[in-house]
Amino acid sequence: MTARSWVGEVISKYPFHVVRHKGILRILTNTLQIEHFPPKSVDDPIRRELELQSTEASIHEWEFKEKEGLSLLVPTTVYPPREDTGLLFSCLSKLGKGDGRKLLEIGCGSGAVSIALAKLGWEVTTCDVNPLAIVATTGNASYNKVNLTAIEGGLDEGGDFINQQLIESHGPFDIITWNLPYLSPVKGDEAKLGPLEDAGLIDTQENNGWGVALLQSLTKEINILKQGGAIYLLHTNNERGNLLQSRWRAAGWATRISSELQFDDGERLTCFAAWKPHEKATRQSHDVLDSTNQYLLEKDLPTGSMVTAKQQLSGRGQRKRVWDTSEGDYAGSWVLDPEMMDCCPGMMQLDAGVAVIDAICASQDIPLPSAHWTNCNPFSNYNLSIRWPNDVWAASGKLAGCLIEGRQTGKHQKVVLGIGVNLGISNSEDYPSTGLRDITNSVTLERFTDLIDTAVSSQFETGILIPSRPNQKNTVWALMTNHLSRGLSLTQDAEKLTVTSISEGGELICHDGRKRRIISDSYNLLWD
């Protein structure tokens, strides 16, 4: 019997009741005859739960904003506000005042995040499989003078919502959020929690964890997330956590980190958002085009729109160099938000290179480099790297190229991103080249098209419910060092340069043995 199946049994056999004393919520249990339980030598989840419940609930003062806090009564088996609580609220508070927008929190615990967001004007529905968490959240909301809806329910191990119809009746939601349980299941004789606490804190052994269980639930016919809505998940950097964004990408969701919290012991908490990519954009596929970039520059299509071509007659790369598209290769372009040109086009091209590698990683179920720069090292198996200013390379040659182009017409500005990826074996005579199928045979052109569109959305899409674009300098540099570590040197005007880093704007920072040089143009540069 799983931890969650004990929840109803505990409540039905040994009911809890709630009383108020001087405005403070107290959780009490009925008088129990402990000697009627099995001997202590036999593990009994109900005994463990009730022994925990005999401990007095504690009061937590949680400051969620400067000079503004909550007073929360937290029963023993309910999760109290901790560092991860603060991180999750910090990320969600960046979305601004709720103004009546709807939010669902899964796993409310003491109600800290839900109550704080209700104070910001969100219409909050919250749920938890621990009935004591629902009792505590309801009482804490009343004590802190906010209105919200608390429902006993959540996800089961199969990815189905408990009390789904009741939860749906309060939706669909603009935001769904969950501080995911991440403790590993208890093994053998290891110390056990009570079953209610197990249900809220321990990751499931099924379906690759609760984060994937939620992903599976969203593929079913449920009316829970609004079009244009977003999911905010918080996880730790264990094996499942490191793979979580890759698995959401593979299922067709764009993802982007909102914030992180690093601990001295090496644990890292990450909060990321997930959304359906380019929902208001168009997607076109053509047999033949002169250039996908040129096509979008000449058309009036919504931001995020993508066009692909099976063959490009005049495909181009940096400095109008020819980009050959062989049959079965990928050639595509996107309309980007023109305000991005106020940023740094050089770094944007490097970020596009990260998107290409992200798409490959999602296809192979390995952690994304954009999720954290430490995920760049495992790519030694594929020997993927970024070569400044706009190329993705594998061990045997160039795999992909990226090009940002803009056009100004009066006050109207248009920005497009083009990406070309060799999927088959490339035969370029100008430089060593390779194809994705030299690395893996598991990705079709159709599948890669979906993955790269999701990756580009993850890098560049903007929206009121989407986190701001993060600075990926560390990730880009880590992928560049994969290329530099092969012993390559850089020459400009016959003078050898040592690459030492990149600037915030994506410029190369080099040293010629006498002084530092900052290079923003690839003209007259030679890698050898």
Residues covered by each model-derived region:
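Mobile active-site "lid"/loop adjacent to the S-adenosyl-L-methionine
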Residues: 178-214
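Long, positively charged amphipathic alpha-helical accessory segments at protein N-termini or as interdomain linkers
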Residues: 215, 233, 341-386, 394-528
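SAM-dependent Rossmann-like transferase core, predominantly class I methyltransferases
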Residues: 35-116, 120, 160, 264-270
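N-terminal lobe of the biotin/lipoate ligase/transferase fold
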Residues: 254-351, 355, 361
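N-terminal amphipathic/basic-hydrophobic helices that include classical n-h-c signal peptides
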Residues: 1-28
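Conserved Class I SAM-dependent methyltransferase catalytic core
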Residues: 212-263
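Conserved SAM/SAH cofactor-binding pocket of Class I
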Residues: 89-169, 175-186
